[in-house]
A protein has these predicted regions:
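A short beta-loop-alpha structural element at the N-terminal edge
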Residues: 1-19
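A short helix-loop-beta-strand connector motif used in the catalytic cores of GNAT acetyltransferases and
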Residues: 33-43, 53, 72
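Conserved beta-strand in the GNAT
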Residues: 50-61, 72-77
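Conserved catalytic-core motifs of GNAT/GCN5-like acyltransferases
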Residues: 109-110, 125-144
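A short, internal acetyl-CoA/4′-phosphopantetheine-binding micro-motif in the GNAT/acyltransferase core
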Residues: 73-83, 110-113
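A conserved beta-turn-beta hairpin within the catalytic core of GNAT-like acetyltransferases
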Residues: 60-73, 83, 102-104
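Conserved GNAT acetyl-CoA-binding A-motif
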Residues: 99-111
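Conserved acetyl-CoA-binding loop-helix of GNAT-fold acetyltransferases
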Residues: 78, 84-97, 119-123
Length: 163
């Protein structure tokens, strides 16, 4: 955990208003009430209970020749004042732990223009699989998307070897 960032906690219905406010502050439109119940849904709050970020992961079947069905990192938002402080990394590592209990690989779709997200995912061992203007139901206006994958089996083996 980086620099005193609290651990991710399961998202609860009481968190939904703060998630919507955070999303709106970033020019987005999260609707947590519509998300599935079998997902990994996490939040990080400071000691005062203020939302610093949220994330989710779930099984996705994109019906796409390029992007396979699998467990995907599905969304993450971090408050502007909390970026580059470990919140996104902590949320992503927790989601990867959740996926590792269910699958041998994790997938992610990132806008090619999102350099910070690409850097984070590469630092966590994700590798680029493909680029396309559309991956599954995600259409990338003004650019392309990057399909990333991480082999969780070799990651677990490497972690065990270091112990």
């Amino acid at each position: 955990m980086g620099l005193g960032i609290p651990a991710p906690q399961p998202m609860r219905a009481v968190d939904y208003p703060a998630i919507r406010r955070l999303s709106q502050s970033l020019g987005r439109h999260a609707e947590p009430e519509l998300w599935g119940s079998g997902e990994c849904q996490l939040v990080i709050k400071n000691l005062d209970g203020q939302l610093l970020g949220w994330s989710r992961a779930h099984w996705w079947e994109p019906a796409d020749a390029t992007a396979p069905a699998g467990y995907y990192l599905a969304g993450i938002e971090v408050a502007r004042g909390c970026r580059h402080r470990g919140v996104g990394r902590s949320l992503t590592e927790a989601r990867l732990d959740w996926i590792a209990q269910r699958a041998s690989s994790a997938w992610c779709v990132v806008n090619a223009q999102n350099a910070a997200s690409l850097a984070l995912h590469h630092s966590l061992g994700f590798e680029e699989v493909a680029r396309a203007a559309q991956l599954g139901t995600v259409v990338f206006s003004g650019g392309s998307g990057v399909l990333l994958s991480k082999d969780l089996v070799s990651s677990r083996s490497a972690a065990k070897a270091q112990v």
